[in-house]
Swiss-Prot record:
UniProt keyword Metal-binding, yes or no: yes
Major location category of this protein: membrane
Encoding gene per record: CYP82A4
Signal peptide stretch: none
Molecular function as annotated in GO: heme binding; iron ion binding; monooxygenase activity; oxidoreductase activity, acting on paired donors, with incorporation or reduction of molecular oxygen
Protein name from the UniProt record: Cytochrome P450 82A4
Superkingdom of origin organism: Eukaryota
Gene Ontology cellular component list: membrane
Keywords of this entry: Heme, Iron, Membrane, Metal-binding, Monooxygenase, Oxidoreductase
Amino acid sequence: MELVLHFLNTTTIGVVSLIFLLCLFLYGPLKKVHGSSKEAPTVGGAWPIFGHLPLLIGSKSPHKALGALAEKHGPLFTIKLGAKKALVVSDWEMARECFTTNDVAVSARPKLLVAELMCYNNAMLLVAPYGPYWRELRKIIVTEILSSSRVEQLQDVRVSEVQNSIVELYDVWRSQKNESDYASVELKQWFAQPIFNMVLRMVVGKRFLSATATDEKAEKCVKAVDEFMRLAGVFTVGDAIPYLRWLDFGGYEKAMKETAKELDVMISEWLEEHRQKRALGEGVDGAQDFMNVMLSSLDGKTIDGIDADTLIKSTVLTIIQAGTEASISTIIWAMCLILKNPLILENKAELDIQVGKDRCICESDISNLVYLQAVVKETLRLYAPGPLSSPREFAEDCTLGGYHVKKGTRLITNIWKIHTDPNVWSDPFEFKPDRFLTTHKDIDVKGHHFQLLPFGSGRRVCPGISFGLQTVHLALASFLHSFEILNPSTEPLDMTEAFGVTNTKATPLEVLVKPCLSPSCYKSM
């Protein structure tokens, strides 16, 4: 009997195994033939439970890791982010299909910890679900806060902050210059000052930072915004594997809650100050800061059940985080690329011709500085603020590139891979601003040309592109116009990237500076 049972068990196992192998043999090729036209290829090597998260978390440059996969698997492929599938787009034509034909389908955002815990429970425009609330809030931001006329009204704020920083650097040079008539300066810290002050003054009417003085509240504010940006760029296990969220691997959830509370207290104080001033009749006429504009538009209102205070605070945080980090990182990468390519500095002649050495840069000069604009475009091509797009989610089943994509699949656009496509860009890894004056002169960065998407495209395109470009152009042009710059070292510049929500330079940027304008210019600023 035992022999029979043993025979039956062995036979059963053998038969089942044989059937399984036969199915694999027959069905496998069939699936490959018929399935390839339906779903994009899936990258192998996924870990149990975690999927391909170790690939992204373990890489200092996830955009380059995904770019290498595109070389192997093509412009469309799928990876697993824990329990979630993500479609990676690495080709401008596929991006065009995404943000035109399928734009509505890909305008949703996935539910993420950072959006819940640090973005006022998804109230911030950048993370808000696509729908009536998002449309109404975006309309207010585009037409009333970041409109051309509103930004133009605050031109004096931008110019004065840049000029203040130039004068402060001139004073630093006078006190610290060496025997060669140069002074050393760390540019990441120096550019952070005018950009942060500029954005804060336009948003809430405050000026915090100075090269010669420190302020406890200012340091606290900058630190909190920096921490927000750091946490916004992390991959959390809870996002990929929701049932493991309670473990809070890395302590990110705790840190997000603490940072959110710190920022909310700060912005709430600003909001209360504005209400008190308005009650006294102050700050309601002339060129108002953005918080006053929002109080005029939103106070006492709700949108889709979200109260005015939450709308205002979330929008203030949106503009501060988007308007500072991206601008600073773009300017720093531009300076790195200029220093690495000394011939570029020779084109400072454009500044001398268009502006001269006896006056300061004005915003009206920027339109004539075509080479400077080309430098900024080329910088955004090589070092986009976000080399991987903010994640989106397919809100419905659709077809992309001939492949079927299921609802709920996440979308990642590899901006860096598109920007370095050799089929579009000759010498794609070389810094060649002249291409935007010749072969690619008609391509802009505003989302209309899918070969160059530093600020996204479609309905979710960044609403503050013009605002950001004005800031970058003015600050960069003013610095290059006012000072000669040198690399203090004979060693190659460290171009290591620190990947997060914004792609920043990992190490400081030390340069030598010397004034190159008439001394009267610095005195008149």
